Amino acid sequence: MAVRKFKPTTPGQRHKIIGTFEEITASVPEKSLVFGKRSTGGRNNVGKMTMRYMGGGHKRKYRLIDFKRNKDGVPAVVKTIEYDPNRSARIALLFYADGEKRYIIAPNGLQVGSTLVSGANAAPEIGNALPLENIPVGTVIHNIELRPGQGAALVRSAGNFAQLTSREGKYCVIKLPSGEVRQILSACKATIGSVGNSDHGLESSGKAGRTRWMGRRPRNRGVVMNPVDHPMGGGEGRASGGHPRSRTGLYAKGLKTRAPKKQSSKYIIERRK
């Protein structure tokens, strides 16, 4: 996908960079795979704010995505490639040979009319989902499971990809987009290729209003708050705020926040950068 800039006929157009949507082939989603989605506004079940800077935005409907790819051996044809307001990647509608319809994350290079299949006997081609033990070393992958049959949990956002670097016994060594190198069970599934919409990171809203349409509220800096509101607030005039901290007092910009005794740490060979 490419991006396009605009002539600065208005202040909001001057810095606006958005996608061209040239790969989108359908404007109406599959009705059987769409459900209502209520906006939380960053509040939990008792109404307490648990995430700041969320609220408003355009109404969205949730598209049910197949992250498990468990219809092994059943071929599917790519019917459409669609926009999904709930994620940065595009989604593809699959029509299976037995009549079932499912959405998947659209990988880079996927075309309408392509035939996809999942399972141990599938060819390592773009869009096919295979167990890691059946994927050649060095292959670029995405939608990676952490536990067999659980569904893809890693490498799902636009433009991302991981690489299968080696095998060690019943584990495969994967290099993730963050730079982390970790072991994952060879029975876990992954999809061949990288996630589509790779130019998403180049986009710029251009104006505050477009950001509000996305459901993101203004983000205020801690150093301009009062001491009651933030550890970095207060002071006479423009103060530096001291050591960078989060609102809850954790050191920012360098503090490792991962739990030191986390069970899964034994699978991490090299920490993320």
Curated annotation (Swiss-Prot):
GO MF entry, a single one: transferase activity
Pfam families to which the protein is assigned, alphabetical: Ribosomal_L2, Ribosomal_L2_C
Cellular component GO terms held in the UniProt record: large ribosomal subunit
Region span, Disordered: 196-273
InterPro entries xref list: NA-bd_OB-fold, Rib_uL2_dom2, Ribosomal_uL2, Ribosomal_uL2_bac/org-type, Ribosomal_uL2_C, Ribosomal_uL2_CS, Ribosomal_uL2_dom3, Ribosomal_uL2_RNA-bd_dom
A single GO BP: cytoplasmic translation
Cited SMART domains: Ribosomal_L2, Ribosomal_L2_C
Keywords assigned: Ribonucleoprotein, Ribosomal protein, RNA-binding, rRNA-binding
Comp. bias intervals (Basic residues): 209-220, 255-264
Lineage top rank: taxon: Bacteria
Subunit details: Part of the 50S ribosomal subunit. Forms a bridge to the 30S subunit in the 70S ribosome.
Sequence similarity: Belongs to the universal ribosomal protein uL2 family.
Function noted in UniProt: One of the primary rRNA binding proteins. Required for association of the 30S and 50S subunits to form the 70S ribosome, for tRNA binding and peptide bond formation. It has been suggested to have peptidyltransferase activity; this is somewhat controversial. Makes several contacts with the 16S rRNA in the 70S ribosome.
Name of the protein in its database record: Large ribosomal subunit protein uL2
Encoding gene (name): rplB
